[in-house]
């Protein structure tokens, strides 16, 4: 049987758990037992977005494609080690193991796929776009387009039918790019 846990949020670089008075119970879909508690307190989304823009985005943009891809691979390996806990949580939502398989292992496989895309890029935080274009008669100067990571944050809204795959697919593409 699942243990009762409190689901925390990672905000401003730290884990935050709801207070007991703000915690809402989550119930097992089959037997109705409390399996976890989540917070329902108001969050300061403006400060969360500011932190994401100034700290999270800044640090992520410093990483090269190789570093970002390897980060995705490490995350996939970590999640794979803990996949049985995901199956247990999925069972509590009413899903069978075969229902959950495509979501859990497909989502982790998606991380591995995006991690492998790093091989298509150099070991720098930008990508070359096209060839060098000589612009002067003597070839003394020219142009080269580059693709750089966008500044800002991404807000993901995920469907309930694939909670693992949906989230991992969305974050993988943005962390790599």
Sequence positions of predicted segments:
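Conserved small-residue-rich beta-alpha loop and adjacent elements
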Residues: 126-177
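N-terminal Rossmann-like NAD(P)+-binding subdomain of aldehyde/semialdehyde dehydrogenases
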Residues: 2-139
């Amino acid at each position: 049987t699942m243990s009762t846990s409190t689901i925390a949020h990672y905000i401003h670089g730290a884990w935050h758990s709801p207070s007991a008075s703000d915690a809402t119970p989550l119930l097992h879909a089959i037997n109705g037992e409390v399996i976890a508690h989540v917070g329902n307190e108001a969050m300061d989304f403006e400060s969360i977005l500011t932190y994401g823009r100034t700290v999270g985005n800044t640090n992520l943009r410093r990483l090269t494609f190789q570093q970002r891809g390897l980060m995705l691979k490490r995350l996939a390996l970590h999640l794979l080690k803990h996949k049985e806990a995901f199956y247990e949580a999925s069972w509590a939502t009413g899903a069978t193991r075969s229902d959950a398989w495509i979501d859990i292992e497909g989502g982790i496989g998606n991380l591995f796929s995006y991690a492998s895309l790093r091989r298509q890029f150099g070991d720098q935080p930008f990508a070359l776009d096209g060839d060098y274009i000589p612009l002067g008669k003597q070839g003394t100067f020219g142009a080269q387009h580059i693709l750089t990571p966008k500044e800002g944050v991404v807000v993901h809204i995920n469907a309930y039918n694939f909670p693992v795959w949906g989230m991992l697919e969305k974050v993988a593409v943005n962390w790599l790019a």
